[in-house]
């Protein structure tokens, strides 16, 4: 079966956001590549973009959360649009609460975590970096 690895574009704060995500999920980055690491005649990198993230990966369970900073030359990511929504299926109600509370810190809750009409324990929020998340736990699954 295919594995889905969400990828998020950032406006220069990918490293900060991923450090925050790592503080909630734990683990270690498997790969961090900066734009300056790829600089060369065929790929010139402006000085202001040298330390931006070209690629970062954080293993979570059997998947990877991937991200990068968008170089200034490509324009800004519209952070008010729904760039993505990441769904997390928790293994327990306690894990769902931990992830929901940890990731939503400093963000805005759109749907407080709790028992949903469809039978799962569910919550939805936008984190302090503008990324939308859904957390659910399905009892008996």
Model-derived features: positions:
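Short, small/polar residue-rich loop motifs at catalytic or cofactor-binding pockets
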Residues: 52, 117-120
């Amino acid at each position: 079966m295919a594995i889905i690895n969400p990828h998020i574009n950032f406006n220069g704060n990918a490293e900060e956001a991923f450090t925050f995500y790592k503080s909630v999920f734990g683990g270690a980055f498997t790969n961090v590549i900066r734009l300056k690491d790829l600089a060369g005649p065929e790929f010139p990198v402006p000085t202001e973009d040298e330390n931006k993230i070209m690629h970062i990966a954080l293993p979570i369970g059997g998947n990877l959360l991937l991200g990068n900073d968008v170089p200034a030359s490509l324009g800004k990511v519209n952070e008010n649009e729904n760039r993505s929504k990441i769904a997390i299926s928790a293994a327990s109600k306690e894990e769902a609460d931990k992830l929901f509370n940890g990731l939503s810190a400093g963000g805005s809750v759109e749907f407080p975590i709790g028992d949903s009409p469809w039978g799962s324990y569910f919550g939805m929020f936008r984190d302090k970096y503008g990324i939308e998340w859904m957390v659910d736990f399905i009892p008996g699954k």
